[in-house]
Regions:
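Short, small-residue-biased leader/transition segments that mark boundaries at the very start
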Residues: 1-6
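Hydrophobic cores of alpha-helical transmembrane segments in multi-pass inner/ER membrane proteins
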Residues: 8-15, 68-81, 140-152, 176-180, ...
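Short, hydrophobic transmembrane alpha-helix segments
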Residues: 16-28, 53-59
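Short aromatic-rich membrane-water interface segments that cap or initiate transmembrane helices
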Residues: 57-69, 126-139
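Transmembrane alpha-helical segments and their boundary/interface "anchor" motifs
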Residues: 66-67, 91-113, 135, 171, ...
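Hydrophobic alpha-helical transmembrane segments in multi-pass integral membrane proteins
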Residues: 107-115, 176-191
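Membrane-helix boundary/juxtamembrane motif in polytopic membrane proteins
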Residues: 157-175
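Extracellular/periplasmic helix-loop-helix junctions in multi-pass membrane proteins
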Residues: 185-203
Length: 217
């Protein structure tokens, strides 16, 4: 069921962080390449006939940006939880690497869906509903912010920037999280209003996650 989808994402990301945090810090480049390879493979496989189970359960969690989003949520909460907590210490160390990995995986989602929606946005915007149009525009803003934040998360780039400038730039992450929530809602609410269980659960779960974060900030 749907609860299992979220459990699966959470379990995958939690296990990834728990077992690979040291390795991610030491060999970040390998993980970035791995994430890029997965992204490209998922993108290409989307065009091939696949058993529904594989399409929904394996490719889907990458194509829909779910794993990347779950990683961003981990990064997001790292900044919101109390500094001294045991949970945070290991996460703080890999925050940059985790957000870069998440960004690479989310770009896979942007390409997979972008082929349809961005094409329509630029060629035939009237074919999109008002919510789809807004979601597509927000998506473009999100991609720009994400690329800027990702590039400046690389240590080599970060070292070249003034600490104050870098900190100010990182604050745009709040805009990113806010727009990400709006984007997710715009995609899910129209279907949720039709009474589709999966989309109703999306609205509820993402609202708890994002509004809970806002309350903690």
């Amino acid at each position: 069921g749907l609860g299992d989808v979220y459990k699966r994402q959470l379990i995958i990301v939690s296990l990834f962080i728990y077992f690979l945090k040291g390795s991610l810090k030491k060999h970040a480049g390998i993980y970035y390449i791995g994430a890029a390879v997965i992204s490209i493979a998922v993108f290409l496989l989307e065009f091939l006939p696949m058993p529904l189970f594989v399409k929904n359960n394996i490719l889907g969690i990458f194509a829909k940006g779910s794993i990347g989003t779950a990683m961003f949520v981990a990064v997001m909460y790292t900044g919101a939880l109390p500094k001294g907590s045991k949970l945070i210490a290991p996460l703080m160390k890999i925050r940059g690497e985790l957000s870069i990995t998440a960004a690479i995986l989310v770009l896979c989602h942007n390409f997979t869906y972008g082929i349809t929606y961005f094409k329509m946005l630029f060629i035939k915007p009237e074919a999109l509903s008002a919510t789809q149009l807004t979601a597509a525009i927000i998506s473009l803003v999100l991609i720009i912010i994400m690329i800027v934040l990702t590039v400046t998360s690389f240590q080599a780039v970060r070292k070249k920037m003034q600490a104050k400038k870098w900190k100010q730039l990182q604050r745009t992450a709040y805009v990113f999280y806010g727009l990400m929530y709006v984007h997710i809602m715009l995609i899910n609410i129209p279907y949720a209003r039709l009474g589709l269980g999966m989309y109703i659960a999306n609205v509820v779960i993402y609202s708890i996650v994002f509004l809970g974060y806002a309350a903690m900030r």
